[in-house]
Amino acid sequence: MILSTTNTIEGATITSYQGVVTAEVVYGTNALRDFFAGIRDMIGGRTASYERIFEKGHQEALRELESNAQKRGADAVIGISMDTGTINVDDKGVLLLITATGTAVKLG
C-alpha cells in the first residue's frame, strides 16, 4: 500500500477513486506527566514524553488509514493530511487527538 501526501503517484495511473478514508487516534493525558511537562516547558526544554505520544499516534493513525483503504480495495491513499488537537474533558484533563484523512485509490 502506497501512502502519499501528494495527489498523484509518480509512474502510476489512478484508475478509480474509492472514496475518502479517515482515522482518529485519541490519548488521555496523565496528570503526573503533565505536571513534569509543565515544569520542563517553563525552563525551555522539550517534552520528550509528549513527542513520543504524538509520534506513536501519527504511526497508529497511518496504520488505521491504510487498513480502512484496504477494506475499500484500494492500492494507495493519496492527499494524506494529518492534524492534531486537544479536547478538554471538564476539569479532569485533556485528551490528545490525532486525525488522518486521504483519498483511497486503485492504481493501474
UniProtKB/Swiss-Prot annotation:
Gene3D superfamilies xrefs: Hypothetical protein apc22750. Chain B
Pfam families per record: YbjQ_1 (PF01906)
Family: Belongs to the UPF0145 family.
Stated name of the protein: UPF0145 protein SYNPCC7002_A1337
